[in-house]
Amino acid sequence: MTESVLDYMSRLGRDARAASRLLARAATAQKNRALLAAADALDAARAELSHANEQDLAAGRANGLEPAMLDRLALTPARIDDMIEGLRQVATLPDPIGEIRDMRYVPSGIQIGKMRVPLGVVGIIYESRPNVTIDAASLCLKSGNATILRGGSEAIHSNQAIARCIQQGLAEAGLPAAAVQVVETTDRAAVGALISMPEYVDVIVPRGGKGLIERISREAKVPVIKHLDGICHVYIDVAADLDKAIRVADNAKTQRYAPCNTMETLLVHAGIAERALPPLATIYREKGVELRGDAATRALLGADVLEATEEDWRTEYNAPILSIRIVDGLDAAIEHINTYGSQHTDAIITENFSDARRFLAEVDSASVMVNASTRFADGFEYGLGAEIGISTDKLHARGPVGLEGLTSEKYVVFGDGHVRT
């Protein structure tokens, strides 16, 4: 690359800004045509995708990437199938752009409503998973946003191969190539440039490790949609149905360990602990989950439960490790969650309607649940289609961010020669 990284990123930004204006007025049928053509291009380019991905995997093995990272990096035939299906699914989703709602007349006689519009240009910064390229590009395209995608250097060849398929889809639909751009330099200065261009980029969505997200949150000069941690809780109330409690607490921890909506701390009311914890501990031990507990939990379950420290209550393990605390009641459970949680997803298991309503009202998280596993905190499960990420922020988008989270609203006003007096 002969131009400087800053000049290169500025060029991408200018092109994306110009493309965003065209995308904002693109017809739904045209956007869907691009998505479906990109899906067909991916299907036809399976050999090319596999070859590019093998280059990344070989480099990753040579550089000592951990097996878990290599697994996330791999584009298996099944994952290519999922990417193709993902594009086709997004094409079937309702287009939010241009929708006008809440139309009403006001005393002056004018009619006022709100129109849903794209954000503009979305910068996506992510690590490892090449499939994020498809998730992000498809949602941004359908919602009328241009996007600049900066994937991890370990996936550069895979991302470029995927981008070529997306570009083919854009071309077939008559949409600008700059609607979806993949950063082709692995220079880390590109990240700093991308998050520092408010004249070109309207929002940044980081997906990756805590260090990356903290850096972007600290240094970005444009708004950021993010979540730092997934410290999710399940609280088993004294009025819980025991079968439901065991089923949910098992699933919330052991269905998968790595996702950000996996339970990391189990809270149990002292009045039900002797009935709920022993059978749960048996399940966890059979599945190889390491248990850490407070003094009451260790006294009940035995010495093989490790002592939970203050740090455990604040830790997202992403591993078969679970912290357990026995609490005196709902007040203590809510206090624990609001003190140690990450405002991601928390659940109560109870048959007491008043306790459920209090939990929903007082737990300060993006998703709060009653008698359901935290693993449901996902755009697909919420009926949003794909998601671009999960936000624990309180401004703009909160929770799983799908198409609507990539839009904003503007007021539209209709009059008939009205003037203000």
UniProtKB/Swiss-Prot annotation:
Alphabetized CDD domains for the sequence: ALDH_F18-19_ProA-GPR
Catalytic activity: L-glutamate 5-semialdehyde + phosphate + NADP(+) = L-glutamyl 5-phosphate + NADPH + H(+)
Encoding gene, per UniProt annotation: proA
Top-rank lineage group of the source organism: Bacteria
InterPro entries: Ald_DH/histidinol_DH, Ald_DH_C, Ald_DH_N, Aldehyde_DH_dom, G-glutamylP_reductase_CS, Glu-5-SA_DH, GPR_dom
Family named by the database record: Belongs to the gamma-glutamyl phosphate reductase family.
Protein name (database record): Gamma-glutamyl phosphate reductase
Root EC class: oxidoreductase
Gene Ontology, cellular component aspect: cytoplasm
